[in-house]
Amino acid sequence: MNSPVVVLDRVTKRFAGHTAVDGLSLAVPSGVIFGLLGPNGAGKTTSIRMIMDIIEPDEGEVRLFGERGAGRDQSGRIGYLPEERGLYPRMRVLDVLVFLAEVKGVPRRAARTRALEWLDRLGLGDWRQRRVNELSKGMQQKVQFISTMLHDPDLVILDEPFSGLDPVNAQVMKDTVLDLRRRGKTILFSTHIMEQAEKLCDELCIIARGRKLVDGALSDIKRTHGGHHLVIGFDGSAGAAQQVFAETGLVKKVDDYGQYAELELAPNADAQQILQRLVASGARLSRFELMEPSLNKIFIDLVGPEAARAAAQPDVEAAHA
């Protein structure tokens, strides 16, 4: 197994008596895409800021590349895209990229060459001489992403990278992140968009109210939460199946969409028994399939109770953004 690039060891951070991150431990192996997932205010940005040494933990330890200490000491090996985007609005796109690369120690000629290559790659080549404030929000976001990559970092940290992107640019970002992994980079990104996380993540950690709910390989998490879900399609009305759905010894939960239904089985229920009952009821089936739960469903099942408890709490993380 790859050695961890990032380790949080029982890290806690408090603001004004509120615990934003509560004893969080996680490890990000080298060469993977790791998702830090949670609802708004869960502690994702606070955790990333502790990794980057923007703020210090009140308790616990941050280790990067096997060394104790946070991102300031390893800044040359890290590319960081913060949630709050910030570029010099009156500078021209190419000039601002070259300037930011030079700040990271990249020689001017190399910075210009890399910036032009990245601009062409992300469809912004024709905009290189335009001022930043002439670009759309999505374009500016891509420019800021480029600025995180020009010094060729080993670890790329992206805080809500898909926020505000249209579907086309979100796909461009997804393809770029996948290519970074193929090149051996380690990517840590935070998001509350489960569809993107499911497509990208090798490993993930779900947090809520600053606490870890689950972490590990995506495949293992799905396996742990799977095996008790059915998708049933009907040729015609599902009315005949309603009595079967109501049997609490077989079915724990039903999402009935009319022409098909998603079932969560009771703990000791047998899918074959449900199939037999449905056939006996006269229901005409077009589909009967055991399925893995989506990451979105796992997220809702895990985070839902925590989110309900957090609803009345102030968003302290946002207040310290």
Task: Tell where the protein language model's regions lie, with residue ranges.
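ABC transporter nucleotide-binding domains
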Residues: 3-6, 13-209, 213-214
